[in-house]
Amino acid sequence: MGKSKKKRSIIRFTVLFAIVCAIGYTIYANAASEQGAVKVGEPATNFALVDLEQERFELGQNQGKGVFINFWGTFCEPCEREMPYIENAYEQYKDEVEMIAVNVDEAPLTVQSFINRHGLTFPVAIDERREVTRAYGIGPLPATILVDEHGIVQKVHTGAMTEEMVHEFFQSIVPDA
């Protein structure tokens, strides 16, 4: 009888310890993921990247225009599905809204092949060291950040977008005339 009581105590302690560890890890992971996360209503973190056409894009140089920032990867099926919607909206709003598609650390040849295959004309840059991705707290792809003409984050969206959503998002950051 003594051995089984001791065994139950060890099992209970082990289960309790595992639960405490799981809770601790969850709290740590949530805090770590929010460290760099941008928040709606706050100024967008400035960044500069050179796109595949060798044009420099700096967020801070776009005061007076809304900016549509899309984080994506060629390996991401939802990213691929939304690209035609983004392309159509870009063509419609490119005179009123700036746009940058930030590829998350893939080879330039892979990215260029994807762009060519899909006929994309909007600016695409590769975040080779994931510095911008980390600064914005991006986890799952795709992720879209909308910044208004004053440099304030208006929306943070993670996940695929429908065509209607893409047009609504672009329209929402068109500066007031």
Swiss-Prot record:
UniProt entry tagged with the keyword Repeat: no
GO annotation terms (biological process): cytochrome complex assembly
Gene3D superfamilies: Glutaredoxin
GO molecular function, one term: oxidoreductase activity
Disulfide bond entries: 76-79
Transmembrane intervals: 13-32
Domain spans labelled Thioredoxin: 38-175
Source taxonomy: Bacteria, Bacillati, Bacillota, Bacilli, Bacillales
Gene Ontology cellular component terms for the protein in this record: plasma membrane
Biological pathway: Protein modification; cytochrome c assembly
Protein name: Probable thiol-disulfide oxidoreductase ResA
Protein family per UniProt: Belongs to the thioredoxin family. ResA subfamily.
Localization in the cell: Cell membrane
Function: Thiol-disulfide oxidoreductase which is required in disulfide reduction during c-type cytochrome synthesis. May accept reducing equivalents from CcdA, leading to breakage of disulfide bonds in apocytochrome c; following this reduction heme can be covalently attached.
Keywords for the protein's UniProt record, in alphabetical order: Cell membrane, Cytochrome c-type biogenesis, Disulfide bond, Membrane, Oxidoreductase, Redox-active center, Signal-anchor, Transmembrane, Transmembrane helix
Signal sequence segment: none
Membrane topology category: Single-pass type II membrane protein
